[in-house]
A protein has these predicted regions:
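Bacterial N-terminal signal peptides that target proteins for export
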Residues: 4-20
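Outer-membrane beta-barrel pore domains
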Residues: 2-3, 42, 61-68, 106-107, ...
């Protein structure tokens, strides 16, 4: 399995740039570990296809917010078809269609939609642009490829911004400086929109990171490089949107701005005794305690004023066990929602193992998790202590 390690700088040969750009697009967002079939057009054009699948079997201590009975569920966590490539030496493109969580909770035959669709313009390694719908440039974990995770998956909530979630529509400028040791991202996007918004202003995001060992060149990251790099990266980001909500929704007064910050660190060190991976982050979303206003906006998400942190670690055994490799992992996270009820505040702990039959292209994973709430909600089983067990199969072509 061949992996691209960096995005090439501008005006390398067309062949090198074409191959590098396709690989970079796949690694940045799809989470695909290798390119699928590629069709070339002329001297500079190309189109690459990818199929990525995650099937889960999950046993959970409740069924829904109204049903406290234990549930066993089989569903498609992710089910994506990706199209990516180059129009010419300067302009590239990427799109994927997805039907996530199909069959989860009895919701079968979900409609597919474009999860990502964007154009890239690569002027140089120091100056690149993305236009369309793509990943938010705020938290590291959201930018980590979902098909290259260290744990079973990302955090269920805290890594996604309240206004935009995992993706948003807009434009980003980014680049690598000092031979990739320093990276910057600047993004302007829709953020919160709609009639309930006090003022329709753009959402502005800025992110930087410093790589002290091997550089992380791509717009996105990986949760683990499976021992192919020595990485120590420190990152930080800020997110802002003006006048996103009213604290007095009925009277349409007392507007509040949205502000958020995050800081993170990622470390991976391969040794003869195996590969150690560790990552941690803290994030704070602040919308002026809008839920505590005179008449709060009923459309505000629960994450409006969320603050939290996580730590996660993994160990990849040095040799094969049978036909594949074994990676064990653990995760702890703490989240406080700052809601009047206090019901959602929680601690989340999980341990698990990946059996990598062909790297990330074909693997089986298992995770056992326990969620404990500070305050037990007497009417909502999803906000009471529970345990969860997940078995997953991942395939990428």
């Amino acid at each position: 399995m061949k992996r691209a390690t960096r995005i090439p700088t501008r005006r390398t040969t067309t062949t090198k740039r074409l191959a590098g750009a396709v690989a970079a697009a796949l690694l940045a967002f799809a989470g695909s570990a290798a390119a699928g079939p590629t069709i070339t057009f002329g001297k500079e054009g190309s189109l690459t296809f990818n199929y990525s699948f995650q099937g889960w079997a999950q046993d959970r201590g409740y069924t829904s917010s109204t049903d406290s009975g234990r549930q066993t569920d089989f569903f498609l966590r992710r089910n994506r078809l990706t199209f990516s490539g180059q129009y010419n030496d300067l302009v590239g493109f990427y799109a994927n269609v997805d039907a996530p969580s199909d069959s989860r909770g009895g919701d079968d035959d979900k409609s597919i939609f474009f999860r990502d669709a964007y154009i890239t313009v690569d002027h140089s390694d120091e100056l690149r642009f993305i236009v369309g719908r793509f990943k938010n440039a705020f938290t590291r974990e959201n930018l980590e490829a979902c098909f290259d995770p260290l744990t079973m998956d990302r955090a269920e909530v805290m890594s996604y911004t309240p206004w935009g979630g995992s993706r948003d529509t807009g434009v980003a400028m980014w680049g690598n400086l000092a031979d990739g040791r320093f990276q910057y991202k600047v993004m302007a996007s829709d953020g919160r929109e709609g009639a309930e918004v006090a003022k329709d202003s753009p959402r502005l995001t800025g992110r930087v990171h410093v790589s002290l060992l091997d550089p992380e060149f791509d717009f996105g990251y990986r949760g683990t490089y499976l021992g192919t790099r020595r990485v120590l990266t420190i990152g930080a980001a800020y997110d802002y949107q003006k006048s996103v909500a009213y604290r007095d929704f009925v009277g349409k007064t007392d507007t509040v701005d949205y502000k958020a910050w995050t800081a993170d660190v990622f470390f991976e060190q391969p040794t003869s005794a195996g590969t150690v991976t560790a990552s941690a982050a803290v994030m704070r979303y602040d919308t002026g305690k809008a839920h505590f206003g005179l008449s709060p906006d009923p459309n505000l998400p629960a994450t409006t004023d969320l603050e939290g942190w996580y730590v996660k670690a993994g160990y990849l055994l040095p040799g094969k066990v049978g036909p594949g490799r074994v990676q064990v992992f653990g995760r702890h996270e703490r989240s406080e929602y700052n809601l009047p009820s206090g019901y959602r505040d929680q601690k989340w702990d999980g341990i698990g193992v990946h059996y990598l039959i062909d790297g990330q292209l074909l693997k089986v994973s298992f995770e056992a998790a326990q969620v404990k709430f500070d305050v037990q909600n007497p009417t909502n089983p999803s906000q009471r202590d529970y345990k969860q067990y997940t078995l997953g199969l991942q395939f990428i072509f």
